[in-house]
Amino acid sequence: MSKVKRVYVEKQAPYAVKAKELKEEFASFLGIKTVTGVRVLVRYDIENLSDDTYQKSLNTVFSEPPVDTLYEEEFPYGESDRIFSVEYLPGQFDQRADSAEQCVRFLNENETPVIKTAMTYVIEGTVTDEQFESIKSFCINPVDSRETGMVKPETLVTVFDEPADVKIFDGFKDMAEAELKELYESLNLAMTFKDFLHIQNYFKNEENRDPSM
């Protein structure tokens, strides 16, 4: 079972400015006039947060009850609605997630939450597959974002593989040229043999040791 909790937050109709703008832009810029409604939800995936602090944060950190509607895990939508979600590319700074983590720590300084966000778009009306792809391209900036799936991850915590044992090239600095050439060819390196010779000279004369990788 996933340790990750998921929350969707949607602006209530009077405050859903972005959703209204997108509907108009799909018609004016993309020429798609069959979209009858657009919904925009902020998706929060949350891990490493106690149940008590999680409950406190729902209507303080993740949503504002007067203007937002909050859904836990899933949200209602029509059978014919088209849905897609957009997340930041790995390495891109997620300002919304960072702010949420800081706000949670204000509620409880002992918490160390991991939060990841995405934007979920619901397209209501009748659109073809081609039109839907145009809508996705319009909403996704490939420089910093990408489409992401709807399946909740098992964890948000990144686990790095244990590094492989370091290999020492015994005898490298004192190898004869013929033996060195044989090693060079076996490694398929993106350098010339002349460069490889320079490396040997460096380890022999400067480092006085065999290299590792």
Where on the chain are the PLM-derived regions?
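Core nucleic-acid recognition elements
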Residues: 1-213
